[in-house]
Curated annotation (Swiss-Prot):
Residues 478-503 are annotated as: Disordered. It is a peripheral membrane protein. It comes from Rubrobacter xylanophilus (strain DSM 9941 / JCM 11954 / NBRC 16129 / PRD-1). ATP binds at G168, G169, A170, G171, V172, G173, K174, T175. Pfam families: ATP-synt_ab, ATP-synt_ab_N, ATP-synt_VA_C. GO terms for molecular function: ATP binding; ATP hydrolysis activity; proton-transporting ATP synthase activity, rotational mechanism. Gene3D superfamilies: 2.40.10.170, Bovine Mitochondrial F1-atpase, Atp Synthase Beta Chain, Chain D, domain 3, P-loop containing nucleotide triphosphate hydrolases. Its main location: membrane. This is ATP synthase subunit beta. InterPro entries: AAA+_ATPase (IPR003593), ATP-synt_VA_C (IPR055190), ATP_synth_F1_bsu (IPR005722), ATPase_a/bsu_AS (IPR020003), ATPase_alpha/beta_chains (IPR050053), ATPase_F1/V1/A1_a/bsu_N (IPR004100), ATPase_F1/V1/A1_a/bsu_N_sf (IPR036121), ATPase_F1/V1/A1_a/bsu_nucl-bd (IPR000194). Transmembrane segments: none annotated. GO terms for cellular component: plasma membrane; proton-transporting ATP synthase complex. Coiled coil: none annotated.
Length: 503
């Protein structure tokens, strides 16, 4: 161990063992009694397949006794046989770090998968198992990070150097939202970004790579993937690979790093698979008993220090839309901001489908965001909360039974609900609307005008899928013009019809 508590990443003389048993991605290896490898050490062996010889990497997970260790494979074990020689590398999995990885696509082992040759200038390799920063090294500075997305900036602001969770069930827009955040922040911020795909679709990774290359931000981004089709060991460790690369930029280069992780649920799911393969007794709902420890080991490394910061955005799949499921529930405790995606809003075509009442942030405080921002956010939430309370009455008795004051609140809430929608740059091909990046000052001012009732006379449709209040006014003028044209056309048709009858 070096003085900072991490392994130095330099290989030591390790022992040589032989494969005893292969059970899918789990491999048992026997070593000489005086050469038993440590937990988390990386082992390598050669496999002969029809495609030729390649190296398989294993990670030690258990010491079984009788000179045997149980390991998990980082890639397919097809072609592996009993008796194959296994080399202990004498260190954990170590991945390349530094500016050489920017613009590259890597796997869990730090090997390039973008067919652009080896990573050049590998000046350093860091082990993926490292301790979290010490308490005295952490930064406590609270500052807002502008995302350009109105509903997030206003109601659940992002803390610079904090952690944001994007919670949602299947198909409600988590990946689209995280891709838009990458587009907005990477383009505006022009800093270093690290994207880690954990157990998600290969298609999405390919699309993201193409979009980043087209936008010109790939040169400042490292992409690390452990996709759906890979063994659980790769999906379980790829998150640590991404964090390790981000830590180098923070600790050595002193940078403010953006860390995107899609999807943290797949990390828990892969850990569940590994735990079952190890023969451990599951806990509630079938999850591994070590879920909290594993999540904490990852999350506590994603933090800000006095040297630099890591601002992370994590997509969190919510199984069956149940937020009490142990996997998303375990993530909650580590976050500074939670962005809840609502299936109900998604069905109403409010995009992004962020639930303004369920979402929250620890920095939505007058001392951090300012008094005006805080007051506007609370007024918006208050109006939407009252609208939610009135919906049952409206459904049973109708809106006409409400008091005049409540009718005004309902109308204003519906405008606010639509105004929280926004056209995305990454969804332009689907909406045919140009994307909008809304500055924080414009967001606060626009919503202040709406909650004060300055635009109660404008149609609800004018507030839908627009940027700031100027876009609302422009859309209202267009709608008014279209309505007048429609009335004139109707009059002309009526006149032609009357003339035809007269003849």
């Amino acid at each position: 161990m070096s003085q900072d508590g991490r392994r130095d990443g330099q290989p030591r003389e390790g022992g040589v063992g032989r494969v005893v048993e292969v059970k899918g991605p789990v491999v048992d290896v026997r070593f000489p009694p005086d050469q038993i490898p440590e937990i988390y050490n990386a082992l390598t062996c050669k496999i002969e397949t029809e495609e030729g010889e390649h190296t398989l990497t294993l990670e030690v997970q258990q010491l079984l006794g009788d000179d045997m260790v149980r390991t998990v494979a980082m890639s397919s074990t097809d072609g592996l046989r009993r008796g194959v020689e296994v080399q202990d590398t004498g260190r954990p999995i170590a991945v390349p770090v530094g500016e050489a990885v920017l613009g590259r696509v890597l796997d869990v082992l730090g090997e390039p998968v973008d067919e652009q040759g080896p990573v050049e200038g590998e000046a350093d390799r860091w082990p993926i198992h490292r301790p979290a920063p010490k308490f005295e090294d952490l930064s406590t500075k609270a500052e807002q990070f502008v995302s350009g997305i109105k509903v997030i900036d206003l109601l659940c602001p992002v803390r610079r150097g904090g952690k944001v969770g994007l919670f949602g069930g299947a198909g409600v827009g988590k990946t689209v939202l995280i891709t838009e955040l990458i587009n907005n922040i990477a383009l505006q911020y022009e800093g270093t970004s690290v994207f880690t795909g954990v157990g998600e679709r290969t298609r999405e990774g390919t699309a993201l790579y193409g979009e980043m290359e087209e936008a010109g931000v790939l040169k400042n981004t490292a992409l690390i993937f452990g996709q759906m089709n890979e063994p659980p060991g790769a999906r379980f460790r790829v998150g640590l690979t991404g964090v390790t690369i981000a830590e180098y930029f923070r600790d050595v280069l002193g940078q403010d790093v953006l860390f995107f992780l899609d999807n943290i649920f797949r990390f828990a799911q892969a850990g569940n698979e590994v735990s079952a393969l190890m023969g451990r007794m599951p806990s509630e709902v079938g999850y591994q008993p070590t879920l909290g420890t594993e999540m904490g080991a990852l999350q506590e490394r994603i933090t800000s220090t006095k040297k630099g910061s890591i601002t992370s955005f994590q997509a969190v799949y919510v199984p069956a839309d149940d937020p009490t499921d142990p996997a998303p529930f375990t993530v909650f405790a580590h976050l500074d901001s939670t962005v809840e995606l609502s299936r109900s809003l998604f069905e109403q075509a409010i995009f992004p489908a962020v639930d303004p009442l369920a979402s929250s942030s620890t920095i939505l405080d007058p001392d951090v965001v300012g008094q005006e921002h805080y007051e506007v956010a609370q007024e918006v939430k208050g109006i939407l909360q009252r609208y939610k309370e009135l919906q049952d009455i409206i459904a049973i008795l109708g809106i006409d039974e409400l008091s005049e004051e409540d009718k005004v609140i309902v109308a204003r809430a519906r405008r606010l609900q639509r105004f929280l929608s926004q056209p995305f740059f990454v969804a332009e091909q689907f909406t045919s609307l140009p994307g909008k990046f809304v500055e924080l000052e414009e967001t606060v001012q626009s919503f202040r005008e709406v909650v004060e009732g300055k635009h109660d006379d404008l149609p609800e449709q004018a507030f839908y899928l627009v940027g700031g209040i100027d876009d609302v006014l422009e859309k209202a003028r267009q709608l008014s013009g279209e309505e007048e044209e429609g009335e004139e056309a109707a009059k002309e048709e009526a006149g032609v019809g009357a003339g035809g009858e007269g003849s």
